């Protein structure tokens, strides 16, 4: 008897739940389907005049020009691909150092030959005694002329020598058998600083070749 009551209650509950479920599905299916259409409004809506006040730039057409238009593919210009970054290889750098060494060696060989050729092509002119002394002094000054390269500047002489030796060890091939010296220079306010100099070099071309090799290796260099 009790079992029959429970079965009847369960059946009634099941019928009610089924009715609610199917009623909800029917309600959902009876709703209209929402369809989204393209917006036909202009890109820019021009505001109206408020209290006889004209809004600035109300007639600007910049937004209208942004509207996508049909583009002819034949009129499109394609930009070239960007350049690829340079790849720096240590092997290429060593080869460049060797080429610099060869260039400096060639310059050192060509320079004396040119000087000797120029001396032989000079016309012989007889000079007075006083003129001979002036020419002799000028020639001695020219022979004693030398060039140095500036590697940097610091505040003390000891620091200058230390930094110069460090740079010399860093570039043993370029600064081989070079004497590091310092030069005291005065500021406008009375203070002093010291230049780090390497040399002497017998010709300007030789000093320039050394500076080019140092600059290639990212070391500051100035001819003095």
Curated annotation (Swiss-Prot):
Q: What is the lineage of its organism?
A: Bacteria, Pseudomonadati, Pseudomonadota, Alphaproteobacteria, Rickettsiales
Question: Which residues belong to any copy of the SPOR domain?
Answer: 141-224
Q: Where in the cell is it found?
A: Membrane
Could you tell me which SUPFAM superfamilies the record lists for this protein?
A: Sporulation related repeat (SSF110997)
Transmembrane found in the keyword field: yes
What are the cysteine partners in each disulfide bond?
A: none
Which InterPro entries does the entry mention? SPOR-like_dom, SPOR-like_sf
Q: Which domain of life is it from?
A: Bacteria
This protein's membrane topology, according to the annotation, is: Single-pass membrane protein
Source organism of the structure: Rickettsia conorii (strain ATCC VR-613 / Malish 7)
Q: What is this protein called?
A: Uncharacterized protein RC0096
One Pfam entry for this protein is SPOR
């Amino acid at each position: 008897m009790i079992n029959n009551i429970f079965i009847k209650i369960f059946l009634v509950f099941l019928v009610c739940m089924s009715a609610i479920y199917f009623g909800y599905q029917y309600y959902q299916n009876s709703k209209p389907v929402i369809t989204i259409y393209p917006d036909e409004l202009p890109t820019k809506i021009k505001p109206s005049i408020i209290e006889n006040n004209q809004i600035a730039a109300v007639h600007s057409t910049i937004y209208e020009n942004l509207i996508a238009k049909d583009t002819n593919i034949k009129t499109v210009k394609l930009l070239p691909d960007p350049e690829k970054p340079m790849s720096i290889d240590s092997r290429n750098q060593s080869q460049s150092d060797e080429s610099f060494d060869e260039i400096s060696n060639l310059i050192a060989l060509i320079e004396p030959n040119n000087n000797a050729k120029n001396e032989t092509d000079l016309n012989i002119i007889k000079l007075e005694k006083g003129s001979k002394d002036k020419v002799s002094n000028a020639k001695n000054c020219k022979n004693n002329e030398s060039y140095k390269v500036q590697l940097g500047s610091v505040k003390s002489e000891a620091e200058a020598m230390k930094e110069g030796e460090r740079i010399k060890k860093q570039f043993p091939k370029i600064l081989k058998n070079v004497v590091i010296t310092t030069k005291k220079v005065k500021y406008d306010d009375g203070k002093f600083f010291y230049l780090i100099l390497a040399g002497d070099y017998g010709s300007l071309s030789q000093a320039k070749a050394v500076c080019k090799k140092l600059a290639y290796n990212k070391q500051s260099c100035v001819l003095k």
